[in-house]
Curated annotation (Swiss-Prot):
Residues 1-16, 30-42 have a biased composition (Basic residues). InterPro entries: Ribosomal_bL34, Ribosomal_bL34_CS. PANTHER family: LARGE RIBOSOMAL SUBUNIT PROTEIN BL34M (PTHR14503:SF4), MITOCHONDRIAL RIBOSOMAL PROTEIN 34 FAMILY MEMBER (PTHR14503). One of its GO terms (cellular component) is ribosome. Keywords: Ribonucleoprotein, Ribosomal protein. This is Large ribosomal subunit protein bL34. One of its GO terms (biological process) is translation. It comes from Christiangramia forsetii (strain DSM 17595 / CGMCC 1.15422 / KT0803) (Gramella forsetii).
Length: 52
């Protein structure tokens, strides 16, 4: 049986990245909540610079 987590850096960036969050109203709400909570990392884009 294939496992559910099949990691891919590109998919991770495209689905959960900062630009993707900013693209929708709900995504912006996510970022606002994370800012209010004081998260060091707002999105997965905060990890490192390269899109693999």
């Amino acid at each position: 049986m294939k496992r559910t987590f099949q990691p891919s850096k590109r998919k991770r960036k495209n689905k959960h990245g900062f630009r993707e969050r900013m693209a929708s109203a709900n995504g912006r709400k996510v970022l606002a909540r994370r800012r209010a909570k004081g998260r060091k990392k707002l999105s997965v884009s905060s990890e490192n610079r390269h899109k693999h």
